[in-house]
Amino acid sequence: KVHATETTVEGTTVELNTNGHHATYEMKISGFDLDYKANKVYGVVLTTADGSEYGLHHVTNIWHGTKLGFNADDPYFASIIGKTITQITFYAADGVYVLPVNVAL
């Protein structure tokens, strides 16, 4: 259990690229001004419409704080393909940020 202030960040948008440079699925988040250099991101969780959760790892899945991605051939992410991401949760040094989104994969 994380003991931190949770903030819901409304109005964010996600640009999905399905043939990214680093990963098969890449997401760039806009409207979420997290200063990742001053406020370390410890982890990110993607939640889908059916309640499934997928944790992201630094370097492999998280770049520059708010750029996210994963490869379709990674067995861990195989079951997320075809689902809709409804929430992205950032665990950062100064709290937890919940971003309601609607990203169909």
Spans of model-derived segments:
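Aromatic sugar-binding surface patches on proteins
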Residues: 62-75
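Short, aromatic- and glycine-rich surface loops/edge beta-strands on solvent-exposed regions
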Residues: 44, 83-93
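Surface-exposed, short loops/turns at beta-strand junctions within beta-sandwich domains
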Residues: 76-84
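Edge beta-strands of extracellular beta-sandwich domains
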Residues: 96-105
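Solvent-exposed serine/threonine-rich low-complexity stretches and specific carbohydrate-binding patches
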Residues: 53-65, 104
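Short, surface-exposed binding/anchoring microloops in extracellular/periplasmic proteins
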Residues: 11-46
